[in-house]
Amino acid sequence: MSVDAATVRKIASLARIAVTDGDVEAMVPELNNILGWIEQLGEVDTDGVAPLAAVIPNHQRLRDDVVTDGNIRDKVLANAPQAEHGFFAVPKVIE
């Protein structure tokens, strides 16, 4: 794939980026070089190579899934503007 000045202007328009004619002419060879590198990557033989997300093996450390109330009710309710009987007190919305 080859990029020309019209394509650069179209991309700039879609991205809402203001570019001058000088910028457009400078971007054409740069974008063509980038696309050339991408084409080279597409030529690499990756048959038999397993996909991976990281270079080093990562093991996710999980904690036991235990239900708990946190035992910090009083600290949480201290942040509330109003609390009654261990719950948040809110004004009545529906009559």
Swiss-Prot record:
Q: What is its EC number?
A: 6.3.5.-
Tell me what reaction this enzyme catalyses.
L-glutamyl-tRNA(Gln) + L-glutamine + ATP + H2O = L-glutaminyl-tRNA(Gln) + L-glutamate + ADP + phosphate + H(+); L-aspartyl-tRNA(Asn) + L-glutamine + ATP + H2O = L-asparaginyl-tRNA(Asn) + L-glutamate + ADP + phosphate + 2 H(+)
GO MF annotation list: asparaginyl-tRNA synthase (glutamine-hydrolyzing) activity; ATP binding; glutaminyl-tRNA synthase (glutamine-hydrolyzing) activity
Q: Which Pfam family, any one, appears in the UniProt record?
A: GatC
Q: Which UniProt keywords apply?
A: ATP-binding, Ligase, Nucleotide-binding, Protein biosynthesis
InterPro entries given in the database record: Asp/Glu-ADT_sf_sub_c, GatC
GO BP annotations, alphabetical order:
glutaminyl-tRNAGln biosynthesis via transamidation; regulation of translational fidelity; translation
Carries keyword Transport? no
Write down the top EC class of this protein.
ligase
- Per the similarity annotation, which family is this? Belongs to the GatC family.
Q: How does it assemble?
A: Heterotrimer of A, B and C subunits.
PANTHER family per record? GLUTAMYL-TRNA(GLN) AMIDOTRANSFERASE SUBUNIT C, MITOCHONDRIAL
Q: What does this protein do?
A: Allows the formation of correctly charged Asn-tRNA(Asn) or Gln-tRNA(Gln) through the transamidation of misacylated Asp-tRNA(Asn) or Glu-tRNA(Gln) in organisms which lack either or both of asparaginyl-tRNA or glutaminyl-tRNA synthetases. The reaction takes place in the presence of glutamine and ATP through an activated phospho-Asp-tRNA(Asn) or phospho-Glu-tRNA(Gln).
Name of the protein in its database record: Aspartyl/glutamyl-tRNA(Asn/Gln) amidotransferase subunit C
Q: Which gene does this sequence derive from?
A: gatC
